[in-house]
Amino acid sequence: MAATLTPEQITEYKGIFEMFDEEGNGLVKTDDLESLMSLIGINPTKRDLANMAKDVDKDKKGTFNCEGFLVLMGIYHEKSKNQDEELRAAFKVFDKEHKGYIEWDTLKYVLMNAGEPLNEHEAELMMKEADKDGDGTIDYEEFVAMMTGESFKLTQ
């Protein structure tokens, strides 16, 4: 799966891995995985982090090697690519006229009627949080941040 990484990514990830290889034995402590991922700019949830730790430390020794880390990063990038494709497809569903943004009324209707419906107050809070530039529409970047939870914490 590391084959999905570019040579530049492999070099970068190996360098970061080596920074955490304190003993120079080709191993990093599983407990350091969160810090390592954070340095790369990836901030997984606790559940995702636990799953990643299981993936790289299959024998439960408390450490993982660089190859396992590169495989993990390949999987992460593949999932990210797939997620991006899904988000683009979802955005296009709402942006039927290809304006590059979603009208508030359209998004509000969907949030209140599809999937796990929100009430009107929750939908408005979510849209206000997502509309970072305050223009009354949700562009693709705002949509991605909203859908991935990067910009939104539902508070009541």
Curated annotation (Swiss-Prot):
Keyword set includes Electron transport: no
Any GO CC annotation of this UniProt entry: myosin II complex
Binding-site residues, Ca(2+): D131, D133, D135, T137, E142
Main location as per UniProt: cytoplasm
InterPro entries: CALM/Myosin/TropC-like, EF-hand-dom_pair, EF_Hand_1_Ca_BS, EF_hand_dom
EF-hand domain mapped to chain residues: 8-43, 44-79, 82-117, 118-153
Tissue distribution: Expressed by the venom gland.
Cellular location(s): Cytoplasm
Alphabetic keyword roster: Calcium, Cytoplasm, Metal-binding, Repeat
Top-level taxon: Eukaryota
SUPFAM superfamilies named in the record: EF-hand
Pfam families associated with the record: EF-hand_7, EF-hand_8
CDD domains associated with the record: EFh (cd00051)
Gene Ontology terms for molecular function: calcium ion binding
UniProt key word Cytoplasm: yes
Similarity remark: Belongs to the calmodulin family. Calglandulin subfamily.
Job description of the protein: May be involved in the cellular control mechanism of the secretion of toxins from the gland into the venom.
Protein name: Calglandulin
Source organism (scientific name): Tropidechis carinatus
